[in-house]
Amino acid sequence: MKHGRTLTELAIELDRQRKVKKDYLLDTRNVKMDAMENFFQITLINDEQRANTILRVNDIAHRQIGSTLGIPAKYYDKMRAENPDLLSTNVNSWFNETPSVRMVRTLDGTARAFLSERYRRIDNYEIAEAVLPIIAQIPDARVASCEVTEQRMYLKVVNPRLETEVSPGDVVQS
């Protein structure tokens, strides 16, 4: 069994994330990237509220920013590692020269995704809310492992009533 969280801990974390996450729809001309000492941050400029939101950029959002702007991943990564100011200059230039509306998904002060405005939001909380009641109705089902990471939610459930012998002496439960 893989170690992770208990089902209760997973539920607590998903509820916490649901409460603190925020999604922004912004014109890229209102997004500015800056290279800091050891990380990158983006500033979301919000003229209506006269307040800017400053966020660290995670690896997933970096990859999506590069893809959105048509910057090859290898070159993006090279600039990110070797010349951060050049990367910021390139990204900011392309944000202004090829404007589009993008969704910036955030969690805990981090830009965790940079997506199309048409992206359909399905959060881990919603998935758990739909799946867990069904699992609870399965007699003898047990959660073997569960975890939520920056990229995915994992939930492994074993139903001992569903089993088969894949080879002599090797029984697998589903």
Language model: regions and residue ranges:
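Intrinsic disorder/low-complexity polar-acidic segments
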Residues: 121-174
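Feature for intrinsically disordered/low-complexity regulatory segments and propeptides
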Residues: 1-130
